[in-house]
Amino acid sequence: MSGSSKVRRPATLASLAAELGVSRTTVSNAYNRPDQLSAPLRERVLEAARRLGYPGPDPVARSLRTRRAGAVGLLLTEALSYAFRDPVATGFLEGLALACEAAGQGLLLVPVSPEHVDVSAVYRAGVDGFVVYSVREDDPHFLAVLKRPVPTVVCDQPAGVEGVDRVGVDDRKAMLGLARHLTGLGHRRVGVICMRLAAQRHDGRVSAARQTEIAYPVQRNRLAGLRDGLAEVGVDWAGVPIWERFDHSVEAGESAAAELLAAHPELTAVVCTSDILALGALRHATDRGLRVPEDLTITGFDGVPEAERAGLTTVWQPVLEKGRAAGELLLERGDRSRPRWITLPTELRVGHTSCAPRDAQRWFSGL
C-alpha cells in the first residue's frame, strides 16, 4: 500500500551478532554468562539489543537446552484466590517470592482444589523444584510431585516424608502452651473450632471416629496439644465439643461459633485453630451480646495482622520466614542427599480476648 511504513522484525541473536561483528556465543554470554565478557563489551551488546529490539534469548529454547526452567513451583491445594486472600498464605507467599527473587528465579503457582483429583497440572508445570504448601498426607497432587525427578520442600504438612526437606513449627507444643494459659486462668469448659480435617467435606460437630482419621497433621497436632493441656487438669477430652469448617474464612468461623455456642452455652472458652476462624467467632460473640473476654474467652493461632489489631490472644508463627526458609532450602539443596527439617519458633501472645472465667474460683476450689 502506498505511503504505508514497513514493520521491522525484531533482531535475532544471529542478526545482532552480525551487526556487532561478534560471535553468537558472545551475544549469548551477555545474557547467560555475563562473567565471561568485559563490562564494556557486555554493555555494547545490551545497548545494541535495546536499539535493534532484540528481546533476549528465547526462554523456551534455553530451558530445552539447559534442562532448567528457572522457576520454582508452589503447590497450593486451594483455589488461586486463596493465596491472595488468606493472610497466612499471603505472608508465606511473600517470603517464598523474596527467596526466589534473590536467586533470580521465577515462581509458578500450581493451585488445585482439595476436592480435585486431576494431577495433570503437576506434571505440566515447567519448574526446577516444588514447594508444597500445607497439604494432607494422602493428597494425590503431592504424590504426583514426589514422582517428578525434582527436589521438593514441604511447608508444614505432611511431615516426615522420606528424602523430603520440611519447614514448619511445632504445632503440638505451641498449642500446649496456649492450653496451659487457659487452664491457668481456670477454664475447664472449653470448645473448639477447627479447620478442615480430611478430604471429605464436613461442617459441624467432629465425632470421635473422625478424630481418628484426621489427614492434616497440623490440625491433628494442634488438637493434640490442646488435649494434652486439658488432660493435665483432668478435663476429659471426650467431653470437649469440636466444630469443623471445611472452608477457611471469617464467615466460616462465625457460623461455627453460632452452632457451637447454641449447642453448648455453658462454654467459658472457645479455642480456634486459626486466627481467621477466631475472628469469625469474635464477630458472632459480639452480635450475640457476649462480652469478650468477660463472658467468653476466644483464642486463635497464627498471629495475623488483623488478629493483632483485634487484640486476639493467639500463637504467633513466623509465616513470612517460613516462606523464605522453604525457598532457600529448595534453591540451596544442590547435591545434598540428606533431608533437612527446619522447625521455626512460635510465641504465645496474650491479648485482650482471654481472662479468668467468672466461676474460676468454684473450679479451683473443686466444688
Question: Where are the language model's segments positioned?
Answer:
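Short acidic capping loops at alpha-helix termini that bridge into adjacent secondary structure
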Residues: 188-189, 237-240, 291-297
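Non-catalytic positions within long, well-ordered alpha-helices that form the structural scaffold/packing
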Residues: 18, 65, 123, 183-186
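N-terminal helix-turn-helix DNA-binding module of bacterial transcription factors
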Residues: 1-68, 366-367
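Hinge/beta->alpha junction and helix N-cap segments in small-molecule ligand-binding domains
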Residues: 78-91, 112-117, 167-177, 192-231, ...
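Short acidic/polar active-site loop segments enriched in Thr and Asp
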Residues: 23, 70, 128, 187-189, ...
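Alpha-helical recognition/docking segments in bacterial nutrient-uptake
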Residues: 1-11, 26, 71-184, 367
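Short beta-strand scaffold positions
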Residues: 17, 132, 272-273
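Flexible loop/turn connectors
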Residues: 13, 254, 258-367
